């Protein structure tokens, strides 16, 4: 297992990355904040959390300002109805971990379902400038209330590079 260092200082999303650009390496795993409103909701099936548990996650596309957006993992799909009073017109403050896009599909794309956590799979649904990667939300709040729900933890990444041993080098 590979240890991932997480920077817990909260920085504004637009101070570490920009829409339509690859996430700079120094921005990965930073704790970021963003304010916007959710304009679309998706189910992301077969996601694996930090404990190795497979479940479906709720992912929203958050519009930030007038012309950009980022995917936000809000929590478990099974808890998506916990905040029925959230409307698309409401501004939401999100804090969470900035994570690189997934590159392998976990499911098929279908209406309301995304195959992986990657803004590339929603480009046909919006003309907004999309940020690379996604925010794994640790907290969400509106002007007057904190949105309480279970939060998911980042998947532990496995190194795919095979090891070399001295006996292999001596032949």
Label each residue range with its predicted role.
Residues 1-171:
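Surface-exposed, charge/polar-rich loops and edge strands
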């Amino acid at each position: 297992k590979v240890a991932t260092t997480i920077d817990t200082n909260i920085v504004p999303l637009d101070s570490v990355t920009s829409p339509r650009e690859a996430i700079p390496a120094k921005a990965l795993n930073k704790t970021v904040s963003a304010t916007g409103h959710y304009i679309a909701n998706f189910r992301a099936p077969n996601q694996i959390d930090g404990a190795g548990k497979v479940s479906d996650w709720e992912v929203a596309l958050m519009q930030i300002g007038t012309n950009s957006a980022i995917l936000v993992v809000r929590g478990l799909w099974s808890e998506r109805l916990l905040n029925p009073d959230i409307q698309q017109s409401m501004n939401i403050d999100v804090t969470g971990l900035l994570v690189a896009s997934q590159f392998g599909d976990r499911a098929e794309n279908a209406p309301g379902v995304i195959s992986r956590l990657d803004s590339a799979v929603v480009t046909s649904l919006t003309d907004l400038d999309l940020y690379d990667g996604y925010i794994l939300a640790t907290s969400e709040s509106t002007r007057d209330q904190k949105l309480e729900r279970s939060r998911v933890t980042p998947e532990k990444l496995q190194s795919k590079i095979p090891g070399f041993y001295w006996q292999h080098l001596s032949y």
